[in-house]
Amino acid sequence: TGRKVLLCERMEKPQRKVRITGKGRCNLTNLCSEEEFLSKVRSGADFVRYAWQQFDSRAVMQFFEQIGVPLSVERGRRVFPTSGRAWDVAEAHIAWCRQQGVEIITHTRVEELHTRNKQISGITVRYNDGSTEQIACQTAILATGGASYPATGSTGDGYRLAHQLGHTIVPIRPSLTPLIADRPTPKPLIDFTLRNIAAQLYIDGKKAAEEFGELTFTPLGVGGAIVLRLSRQAVDALIDERKVELRLDLKPALTAKQLEARVEREKNALSAKTPLRQLLAKLVPSVMIAELARRSQLD
């Protein structure tokens, strides 16, 4: 378009968060339908709908493949770089920006936005050596991230700068976050991942949401893809001081009757003197047996 574009990056290189997202693999997008995608948006769906219609997941795939990032579609219609490296996505994107004439300056923090007649007129930046400079511009795009990961540059500057311009800032709260349980995780379970399970979120005793996929036990609670997807609702409820429970279904493909029948078959295949722990070993991961037996007071 002939516009001169300057990208001010606070860190030593752009896209620090992209490089670590998706466990370092970078889940770029998802090939679900528009309605399915928007059904996952907790608030502001109309705003997201407009953005989606301008640049949907197919457009995302086409863009990255055109700039040299081969993509693969995995289980759950998730799209990843074929290399499995988030680094490749970041570097290709930066290279493309430079090819388009974008000037990128690093170690540069935007401290203030200036206006004239209610229009953006410039910015003040602070460089790594402590010096400052005012740069004239006609447009400023705030792309600062939130306040969730200061080590990547997300320290909440965007909220402060938007507030300077008179925008209303709603209270921020965690989202896409692991959850802390009411008791520490038993050591044998730490870093253990359950796959192909269901997690049901209950708020004040009522089922609020359910997700399927992977869950990982952390030292203080649970994480993993399904927990991240449920965390927004859980956090909102916790802030409102409501009771929050997470219930796990290790066999979501089976109905209660089917599971009961399987337990009966496994039990009948064992002798009467076989410890119940041996029966559990046929139904749940071995690393969970000791804790399940202890909590259920089984021998």
Task: Give the ranges of each region predicted by the language model.
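Short beta-strand segments that buttress and anchor functional surface loops
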Residues: G122-Y127, L201
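A conserved short coil-to-beta-strand element within the FAD-binding core of flavoproteins
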Residues: T106-I120
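Glycine-rich loop(s) and the adjacent beta-strand/alpha-helix scaffold that form part
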Residues: T139-T185
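Core beta-strand elements of the Rossmann-like FAD/NAD(P) dinucleotide-binding domain
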Residues: N128-T139, E210-G213
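N-terminal Rossmann-like FAD-binding beta1-loop-alpha1 element of flavoenzymes
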Residues: T1-L7
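An anion/pyrophosphate-binding glycine-rich loop and adjacent beta-alpha core
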Residues: E12-P14, R19-I20, E35, P70, ...
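Conserved N-terminal/central alpha/beta ligand/cofactor-binding core
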Residues: R10-E103, T108
